[in-house]
């Protein structure tokens, strides 16, 4: 029986930038909501102060406005904490992402060093020399060696993808 082949696609730099931009936009949106709510609270406080100055006694209406301001203040606090939490998570994800990218880069570098080892470089140099000399049999032999090296390389890359 044959198993299904699954393809894992590493997100491209462009995808990562888009994701980061979306996260930044969400953070900015959260901050903007908090700013709007803070301005609304300030306006309500100013109105309440004005109402209190005009009246000798604090009535039911002023108490309701005070409750409303306190409610909005708690909502603002909740929004700010939520935005901070999301921002903190974004930073953690970026750190993980960066370490993941660094790890991938390191693996790729090791693979490239393995692939383009001295033997491969020697084969390529010999091939260049054979092109100048036009030695058909020697060139054929070098092409076979190069093909074998490339087959090994392909297998190594497949293993890296798994």
Where are these regions (language model features)?
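Feature detects intrinsically disordered, low-complexity acidic/polar segments
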Residues: 1-162
């Amino acid at each position: 029986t044959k198993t299904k082949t699954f393809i894992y696609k590493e997100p491209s730099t462009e995808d990562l930038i888009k994701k980061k931009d979306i996260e930044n936009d969400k953070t900015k949106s959260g901050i903007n909501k908090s700013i709007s709510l803070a301005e609304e609270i300030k306006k309500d406080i100013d109105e309440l102060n004005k109402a209190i100055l005009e009246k000798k006694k604090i009535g039911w209406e002023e108490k309701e406005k005070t409750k409303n301001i306190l409610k909005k203040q708690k909502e603002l606090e909740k929004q700010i904490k939520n935005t901070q939490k999301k921002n903190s998570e974004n930073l953690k994800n970026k750190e993980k992402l960066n370490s993941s990218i660094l790890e991938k880069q390191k693996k790729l570098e090791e693979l490239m060093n393995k692939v383009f080892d001295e033997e491969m470089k020697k084969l390529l140099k010999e091939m260049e020399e054979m092109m100048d000399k036009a030695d058909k049999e020697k060139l054929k032999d070098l092409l076979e060696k190069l093909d074998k090296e490339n087959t090994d390389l392909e297998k190594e890359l497949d293993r890296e993808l798994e």
